[in-house]
Each structure stands twice: as C-alpha cells, then as structure tokens.
C-alpha cells in the first residue's frame, strides 16, 4: 500500500494568486479546516510546496 499524507487547509484562498487557488482545488481542499488524504508522491509534494503557507501536512 502506498504511503499517504494528510493535508489540512489552514488559511483562506481569498485574495491569493489564481494558480494557488487552482493548486488547492487540485489537492481537493475547499475550505479552511478541510482535510484530505493523498498519496505521498513527488507531484503531490510539489503542490503542497507551492501553497505551504496555507496548509498543514501530517505524515
């Protein structure tokens, strides 16, 4: 089974760059406090790194 990470949105997407909003939607995050579980792949890690200041990651 693939390793997974939990990603939680901690800050609002209002007033952010359109590509940051798109990245959050790509991760499946829709609102503050929303948590999703994703596979720990380089693609997902890259998306998290792009919006690191708006999310919290748990291994």
UniProtKB/Swiss-Prot annotation:
Keyword Isomerase belongs to the record: no
Keywords: Ribonucleoprotein, Ribosomal protein
Gene name in the database record: rpmD
Top-level taxonomy: Bacteria, Pseudomonadati, Pseudomonadota, Gammaproteobacteria, Enterobacterales
GO CC terms: cytosolic large ribosomal subunit
UniProt cross-references to InterPro entries, sorted A to Z: Ribo_uL30_ferredoxin-like_sf, Ribosomal_uL30_bac-type, Ribosomal_uL30_CS, Ribosomal_uL30_ferredoxin-like
GO BP terms: translation
CDD domains documented for this protein: Ribosomal_L30 (cd01658)
Similarity section: Belongs to the universal ribosomal protein uL30 family.
Protein's name in the database: Large ribosomal subunit protein uL30
One function term, GO molecular function aspect: structural constituent of ribosome
Quaternary data: Part of the 50S ribosomal subunit.
Residue ranges the record marks as coiled coil: none
One Pfam family it belongs to: Ribosomal_L30
């Amino acid at each position: 089974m693939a390793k997974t990470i939990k990603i939680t949105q901690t800050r609002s997407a209002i007033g952010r760059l359109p590509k940051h909003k798109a990245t959050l939607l790509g991760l499946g995050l829709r609102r503050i406090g929303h948590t999703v579980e994703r596979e720990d792949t380089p693609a997902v890690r890259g998306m998290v790194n792009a919006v690191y200041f708006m999310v919290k990651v748990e291994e």
